[in-house]
Regions:
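Alpha-helix capping/helix-boundary segments
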Residues: 102-103
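Surface-exposed amphipathic alpha-helical tracts and adjacent flexible/coil segments at the periphery
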Residues: 1-25, 29-39, 54-55, 61-71, ...
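Aromatic- and glycine-enriched glycan-recognition loops and surfaces
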Residues: 43-52
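Basic, amphipathic alpha-helical recognition segments used for DNA target recognition
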Residues: 106
Length: 348
């Protein structure tokens, strides 16, 4: 039976430096990948020697380490990679994140003392799948980003009945397609970069043109979602029984991870101290926006269950910043920019 405890803050670690930054900034756990067979092949990732140093660093600071093995594998690939997974378990990783059901079954059987997490790449929407996963040896399900708060709460209650924890993405990038089901990347350009093999080309971040009967309706970054932020829903997610809040971003740099972890650590601690209010959420959300956002805002469309037009980032899919005012004058010769701030003051 799962004992109710303080919700876990799970942070990304694309390399050893970022692992240390995440732990020092307040993460309860980190997740990472080795050089092969993780869903973020573009990250630096870890050698076994780096993994050993990272596990030791985390454990001496009471943090856990989860190893992502969350791609689909052929039988031959798994046979070749299995000794590496066994070595990682011997080093002391606390859990394994998997996508492939055959991999899940084998690892749960061979390593019963290691937590097995079902990746969001498994695309577990139906609550009827929880019992099957529990019977195979899973300990936690990472729920799809596309669920509303009501759906998360319902599924969490059902999962707990099968002794399964649930994990929810709290912050970071949102895919335009359901995780684990997107074939868009494999169709793009070279035709070889599969999102289910760790090599997503992110074609949703590119520019497109929309036509109807030969008439161009619009163009731009039409498929690029804004990033996700659950700060205004954090209290509800905790009350629903979710076990872990996950920050996306194994390909983000150390500054991004430091800021995101610090902000969510503040909110989680404030909740348990009875101090999480609208003013604190507003302050922290502003800090998160400065850290990174697409389109000048975050999206909560899936969490709210609404069907508005605030999901996509708009004209620009990269780091957007925050609006501080309107540029009123440029003096190119001496590099002077005059900006009008909302409160009527002037900065030069």
């Amino acid at each position: 039976m799962i004992t109710k405890k303080k919700i876990e803050l799970l942070a990304p670690a694309g390399n050893l430096e970022i692992l240390k930054v995440a732990v020092d900034s307040g993460a309860d756990s980190v997740y990472l990948g080795l050089k092969e067979y993780s869903a973020r092949a573009g990250a630096d990732n870890f050698t076994l020697d780096e993994l050993e140093e990272g596990v030791d660093y985390a454990h001496t600071r009471s943090a856990k380490v989860f190893l992502a093995v969350n791609t689909l594998m052929s039988d031959n690939e798994f046979e070749l990679f299995y000794p590496t997974i066994a070595e990682a378990v011997n080093i002391g990783v606390d859990g394994l994140i998997v996508q492939d059901l055959a991999v899940l079954t084998k690892l749960a059987s061979d390593f019963p003392d290691v937590t097995i997490n079902c990746s969001t790449q498994m695309n577990i929407y139906g609550a009827d799948e929880f019992k099957k996963l529990a019977d195979l040896g899973a300990n936690r399900v990472v729920l799809p980003r596309e669920l509303s708060c009501d759906e998360i709460e319902t599924r969490t209650k059902i999962a707990l009945g099968y002794n399964l924890e649930t994990e929810v993405f709290a912050h970071g990038a949102v895919c335009v397609c359901a995780s684990g089901l997107c074939l868009f990347s494999a169709m793009n350009r070279s035709g070889t970069r599969s999102g289910n093999r760790g090599s997503c080309a992110q074609p949703c971040r590119e520019e497109y043109q929309l036509y109807n009967n030969g008439l161009k309706l619009k163009d731009g970054h039409l498929l690029s979602p804004k990033d996700r932020d659950v700060s205004e829903y954090l209290a509800r997610l905790i009350k629903s029984g979710v076990s872990s809040l996950k920050i996306e971003g194994r390909m983000r740099d150390a500054n991004y991870v430091r800021s995101a972890v610090y902000c969510y650590r503040r909110m989680i601690d404030a909740y348990y101290e009875g101090k999480l209010d609208k003013d604190l959420i507003k302050e922290i959300r502003y800090d998160l926006l400065i850290n990174f956002n697409r389109g000048g805002a975050f999206t909560t469309q899936y969490l709210s269950g609404s069907k508005d037009d605030h999901l996509l980032s708009g004209e620009y899919p990269g780091k957007y910043g925050v609006r501080i005012g309107r540029i009123s004058r440029l003096e190119a010769g001496n590099g002077l920019v005059t900006v009008g701030i909302k409160n009527g003051a002037w900065w030069t």
